[in-house]
Amino acid sequence: MKKIILTLLVVLTTSLSYSQSCCQLAFASNEGNMSEFTTDENFVASHQIPLEYNHNSLVGGEMITFKTTDVTDGNGYLVKSKIKSNKWLFVYQEWWGLNDHIKKQADILYNEMGGNVNVLAIDMYDGKVATTREDAAKYMQSADEKRLENIVNGALAYAGKKAKVASIGWCFGGGWSLKSAILSKKQAIG
């Protein structure tokens, strides 16, 4: 248990230090949804185009769907714990969408926690994945905050009422990691 907590602290500290550099102002108010960044040429240009990569999970990760609180199901990439567990790590994508790089990160985090935590990389763009900065900006700008909250709440319901949830994300996902901790209320552990 100490190893899991230590790993989460290291990962969260690292991600928070990065997220402070590019996306710190987006969630300064309850209305911030990061779309303001999509018109900032420096912000857009600071994102390197992801290298081509096709992920094949070695730990059993697979795409799933789950019910949300609106009419459209949510999607995610799930790596189930080796043992029955109510411990969950929600992984939030950066502005590119739930691409194969995020799936790889989910697998890495799963392995770092000894395979004893359910890891769910949540698709915040309903299946859209950007390969250009322009598409990434468009997807982030058009992301509807209510829909995103419905996706998070659907993921929480999928995890179950007894789930203890930690979260991590990068840039866009870092903001949603924070928001999901707020939405998770007593289920949030980090």
Where are these regions (language model features)?
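Sec-dependent N-terminal signal peptides
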Residues: 4-13
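Alpha-helix termination/capping residues and helix-transition junctions
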Residues: 11, 83, 184-186
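Sec/Tat signal peptide C-region and signal peptidase I cleavage site
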Residues: 15-19
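Serine-hydrolase catalytic machinery in alpha/beta-hydrolase-like enzymes
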Residues: 22-40, 50, 54-57, 62-159
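Extracellular/cell-surface secretome signature
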Residues: 43-44
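Primarily recognizes the serine-hydrolase "nucleophile elbow" in alpha/beta-hydrolase
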Residues: 154-190
